[in-house]
Amino acid sequence: MTTETIDGVRLTTKANVYFDGKCVSHSFALPDGTKKSVGVVLPATLTFGTAAAEIMECVGGSCEYRLDGSDEWKQSGPGERFQVPANSKFDIRVTEAYHYICHYA
């Protein structure tokens, strides 16, 4: 199931812009203080580092991702999620706009 709306959030209005605009996101917090971000990755191959563990949820488009230490690219599409450990990194390869929610652990 793909998340289409998130009610009752506190949104940071200034965008987080990475990789010369290839990734743009907005951070928000749920009423219980849980932090997340929602954004889009435009066509590119990028490497992201993580401080906290992350769960990437695809809400539109698709991507291929490769976790740190792996040679295997895996596909992720709408309604699918993948997990990235804390203090790690992952590669993401996008050929069409990839819309996501990042759930921080």
Curated annotation (Swiss-Prot):
Cellular component terms per the entry's GO annotation: cytosol
InterPro entries: Ppnp, RmlC-like_jellyroll, RmlC_Cupin_sf
GO molecular-function terms, A-Z: guanosine phosphorylase activity; purine-nucleoside phosphorylase activity; thymidine phosphorylase activity; uridine phosphorylase activity
Keywords annotated in UniProt: Glycosyltransferase, Transferase
Top-level EC class as recorded in UniProt: transferase
Role of this protein: Catalyzes the phosphorolysis of diverse nucleosides, yielding D-ribose 1-phosphate and the respective free bases. Can use uridine, adenosine, guanosine, cytidine, thymidine, inosine and xanthosine as substrates. Also catalyzes the reverse reactions.
Protein name in the entry: Pyrimidine/purine nucleoside phosphorylase
